[in-house]
Amino acid sequence: MDRTLESLQLVIARVLPHRDPALVFKDLNVVAILQEFWESKQKKKAVLPSEGIIVYESLSSLGPPFVSYVTLPGGSCFGNFQSCLSRAEARRDAAKVALINSLFNELPCRRITKEFIMESVQEAVSSTSGNLKDADDPSTSIGAYHYMLESNIGKTMLEFQELMIVFQLLHWNGSLKALRETKCSRQEVISYYSQCSLDEKMRSHMALDWIMKEQESPGIISQELQVALRELEEVRKAGHELRFYKEKKEILSLALSQIYSDEVTTSSWDNQMSLALHGYR
């Protein structure tokens, strides 16, 4: 633990040279420090200003505990894990979680290397009772995972997670299974979706898929939404990256809103959402 803390302090000294590494996480202005950290990174990459924006979102609530999310450039998302008595406190706590993860992501051990790939594939084989020989066959799950890691050598784990989010959602949505049934190879699917960003168009398509599922199995969206909300809260309180769970919640909420928008008034829609979330609460 001491060695990790020392490594993080070295990262702070390199990226934020005018800050005292020992005081960064105690600074109440952690929101500004997080902004400064990412502005420093974006300048080195010479990206457009709009691509370096940090976005904060506070959940509407009549009283504490308050919840705040912060989305970093690239899409990684974190939330406050402490029980916060004010929106400002929740925002600071979310920023602190994001800053710790951002700094940790700069460590050499968080970069994809040949050694990292070998260890990850071996772990995947052990956890799935697979075969190490499958790593060279992109048509297998292990082979597809190996191919994706190889395609992203040199990237950090946060960058890799940002790519994986699309495939996680496609798997959850059932789209990957449907693509396999059309005889598309895993390699073709990976190559295509690696170039796709998770935008409003993709979310709308996924919401439409869930609307079709709802027609076949009434109530499935509400059930999935309850699960997604429970998972989101658990992951947030653990201080982990939570974009996958947040995207699931937003896609399912979008699907519900589209189903009822033409059938009920705004007040009835609010009642429907309350009923959908009743099991979660």
Curated annotation (Swiss-Prot):
GO cellular component: cytoplasm
GO BP terms: autophagosome maturation
Family: Belongs to the LIX1 family.
Name by which UniProt lists this protein: Protein limb expression 1
Organism encoding this protein: Gallus gallus (Chicken)
Organism placement in taxonomy: Eukaryota, Metazoa, Chordata, Craniata, Vertebrata
Gene: LIX1
